[in-house]
Amino acid sequence: MKKLYLASSIDVTAAGVAKDIGKDPKRLRMAFISTAAEPEKGNKDWLDDDRNGLIKVGFDLFDYTITDKTVKDFQNDLQGVDIIHVNGGNTFYLLLQARKSGFDKWIRESVENGKIYTGSSAGSIIASPDIKVIKNLDKSYWKELKTFEGFGLVDFIIFPHWGNKYFKSSYLNHRLKTAYKPENKIILLNDRQYVKVENDMYQIAEVPL
């Protein structure tokens, strides 16, 4: 069964995700992929918050990057892992490294074969068929990417951090102007929400305040 849990902010929703997975998180090995944070400048407390949120609810977690890796590395390093968590940061950098390494193809096959995928922010966005609807936000890596197909794990795209004051300008001035088209299947998530996916069925869940 295909299972995904796509969050806006995993530090807030980790307990809900763990409950929905339905197994003792201490018995689940998780790869915490922080690749998207590599080009980000300034304070990265949010990265620590996401990692610590998952650790707090009990996941057996280790850090991992897909940068400079190959499919053979993933087969060796991640084959026995129960959950692949792809965290936030720069979605375009993440996509570029996924393309270079072959992670995009490897993760599609792995999820189809039953490996659980969790995402936060950029890690949720990239699960979509295509990320071009957010490309006005950041022109970095466009030339290298050329096309903007995501992992294609779901048939919609997550817009995270809805209602968060720090993202208000990017939504009002860029993202909504690009995305406001009938062909775009978009799910807006605030930081207490996540989408849980089982095969072709999905629903929005929300953790209480």
Regions found by a protein language model. Give the residues of each.
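General beta-strand structural signal in soluble alpha/beta enzymes
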Residues: 6, 63, 85-86, 117-120, ...
